[in-house]
Amino acid sequence: MDNSTIVFIAVLGVAFIFLRWLIAPIPPQLPNELNEALANSVNNSNRPNNSNNSNSATNSNANRRGRREPSDDMIEVVQTIAPQLTRGQIRMDLERSGSVEVTMERYMETGSLPFPPGESAATQSYQSDISEHSQATKKEPENLIDKYDLKSKIKGDEGEGIENIDENKWGSSKEERSSLLNKKREEMILQARKRLASQLQNEVAL
C-alpha cells in the first residue's frame, strides 16, 4: 500500500469523525442554560426600572418630609372662613400647599377643595347637617369678629388693622408658634371680611 492510499484513508477517517461531531444531538442541559441566560437578561433589564422607582419614591418621601405637617390651628383657620369644607378636604390641601394662604386662595378661586380618597360630597352634606343642627341649638349665632374679639382691629381700611406676618417665619417655641398662628387667623378673617364687603359693593353697583 503506497503513501497516497494511507493519506486518503486517514483523511476519510478524520472527515467521518468531524461529520459525526457536527450531527451529534444537542445535550439536554443546553436548553436549561439558555433559559437561565434569558432569565438573567430579563432581570438585568428590570433593574434600572426598579432603581428609578426607588429613586422616585425616595424623592417623594423627601418632599413630604420637607413640608410642614398641617396643625389643628391651621385647619381651624381655614374652617372658620370656609365652614362648608370638611377637615379632610382642608388637611389634604394643606399637605399639598403647606400654606394657609395658598389653600385659601385656591378655595376663593374654585369655591371648594378636592375631596380626599374615601370621602365624597355625601360625607360633606352629612357633616354640614350636623353642623347646622349644632348651630341651631345655640341661643345666638356667634360672629367671627365677636368670637375672636377683632372689633378693635377693624379700622377705616380693614386690612390695616393687623400687622403683616412673614410667611417664611416659623416660631422656635410652642408659644411663639401659637401666637403666630393666632395672628395669621386674625389676618385671614379680616381679609375675608374685606373681600366680602368689596364683592357686595360690586354687586350693588351692578
From Swiss-Prot:
Gene3D superfamilies: DNA helicase RuvA subunit, C-terminal domain. Residues 1-5 are lumenal. PROSITE patterns: CUE. GO terms for molecular function: ubiquitin binding. CDD domains: CUE_Cue1p_like (cd14424). It is a single-pass membrane protein. Residues 130-158, 166-179 have a biased composition (Basic and acidic residues). Residues 70-113 form the CUE domain. The chain crosses the membrane at residues 6-26. It is found in: Endoplasmic reticulum membrane. Keywords: Endoplasmic reticulum, Membrane, Transmembrane, Transmembrane helix, Ubl conjugation pathway. InterPro entries: CUE. Residues 41-73, 111-179 are annotated as: Disordered. Residues 41-63 have a biased composition (Low complexity). The keyword Protein biosynthesis does not apply. Residues 27-206 are cytoplasmic. GO terms for cellular component: endoplasmic reticulum membrane. Forms a heterodimer with UBC7. Component of the endoplasmic reticulum-associated protein degradation (ERAD) pathway. Recruits the soluble ubiquitin-conjugating enzyme UBC7 to the cytoplasmic face of the endoplasmic reticulum membrane where it functions in degradation of misfolded or regulated proteins localized in the endoplasmic reticulum (ER) lumen or membrane via the ubiquitin-proteasome system. Belongs to the CUE1 family. This is Coupling of ubiquitin conjugation to ER degradation protein 1. The lineage of its organism: Eukaryota, Fungi, Dikarya, Ascomycota, Saccharomycotina. The gene is CUE1.
